[in-house]
Amino acid sequence: KGFELSFAYHPIKSLQFSMNYGYTHARYLEYKKSATEDFSGNRLPMVPNHTLSMDGTYTVLQAGWFDKIVVNAGLTGLGRIYWADDNVVRQNFYATLNAKVSLTKGIFTWDLWGKNLTGTDYIAYSFKMSTGNYAQKGKPLTFGTSLSMTF
């Protein structure tokens, strides 16, 4: 069970906003792994209850020396996520903020970007072994640049 909502708004040609939200209520109807392990009613592992993305983009054409400047910021959120059938280990809802500035001149585009600008600490993946639970942390605050050529 679940639903999704999408929204897009363009107040002026150069400015765009979008928002997407999804809710999932995914549970095992019946799942008895053994006589002592009954996961019936538990949430499915690795299926987030909520997904969220919000995005804003502003584009300037013929901006001085550049043919185009694009400024973008976006928020992405996930959670609660259970990592195994027993629903013991979980990641609560978290959100990361990302941004990018793109400068285009002719066939070249130079991007300057930042990811997880809020430095959100989260678990990207977790798994269970006989020796315990193991987790991979999400990516920290990251900055970067790229140069691309379109022809």
Q: Language-model features: where?
A:
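Gram-negative outer-membrane beta-barrel transporters
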Residues: 1-85, 146-148
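Generic secondary-structure boundary/loop-capping signal
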Residues: 25, 41-44, 91-93, 114, ...
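Residues that define the transmembrane beta-barrel architecture of outer-membrane proteins
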Residues: 1, 48-52, 93-97, 106, ...
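Sparse recognition of residues in long alpha-helices and their boundaries
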Residues: 35-36, 72, 89, 117, ...
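Short, glycine/charged-rich beta-strand-loop motifs at protein surfaces that mediate ligand recognition
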Residues: 84-91, 97-100
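C-terminal beta-signal and adjacent terminal beta-strands/loops
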Residues: 76-84, 102-151
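Alpha-helix C-terminal capping segments
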Residues: 7, 98-103
